[in-house]
Design a protein with these regions (language model features):
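Surface-exposed interaction regions that form or flank ligand-binding interfaces
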Residues: 1-67, 76-79, 85, 90-93, ...
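Phosphate-centric recognition/catalysis
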Residues: 70
Length: 172
């Protein structure tokens, strides 16, 4: 698999210095560095499983915007936009609703990861159409978890959900 890493504030060897970690946290938010670590775990697994026919673009910034697409995977099955999460706990995904489940009660989460992954997929699809790239299957948005402490109960979610125990199966 060919990896194109466009992560901002990284050194030539791919590491992030302490100063750049602080800059990234201030510029992109507190979850920036944990998100990068989760992405790296996912990329390591995908790199072992996928062949040379795949290209992975990491943290691509779309032209004329500040939208950062975490992972774009291009290969024979098509184009997939992968949003990697490091959250833990028990969640429910029903259509476009995303929230925590505790004591049998559902509570909407402050950040809806399903909608975020879905919107990233739509943004990439629109971006590619403007660049005159057409794909028969379109762009598939995926929410991928690398944390085994995350449980998701799903009922027809708007994006494909891949839990940590199924990442290798997803890649094969």
């Amino acid at each position: 698999m060919r990896i194109i890493d466009k992560t901002p504030l990284t050194n030539e060897d791919g590491s992030i210095s302490f100063i750049n970690r602080i800059k990234g946290t201030l510029q992109y938010g507190f979850s920036w560095y944990p998100d990068l670590q989760a992405q790296q775990k996912a990329i390591d697994i995908l790199d072992r499983q996928l062949g040379k026919k795949f290209i992975l673009v990491r943290n691509h910034i779309l032209e004329n915007s500040k939208i950062i697409v975490p992972i774009i995977l291009i290969g024979p099955p098509g184009i997939q936009v992968i949003y990697v999460t490091h959250v833990q706990g028990s969640y429910r995904a029903k259509n476009d609703a995303w929230g925590t489940v505790s004591g049998g009660n559902f509570k909407d989460a402050s950040i809806n990861l399903l909608k975020r992954a879905h919107q990233l997929g739509k943004v990439v699809e629109i971006y590619l159409k403007k660049k005159s790239f057409e794909f028969p299957k379109g762009v598939e948005p995926i929410l991928l978890s690398v944390n085994p402490a995350l449980h998701i109960s799903s009922v027809r979610p708007i994006v494909r959900i891949v839990l940590s125990d199924a990442v290798e199966r997803f890649a094969s």
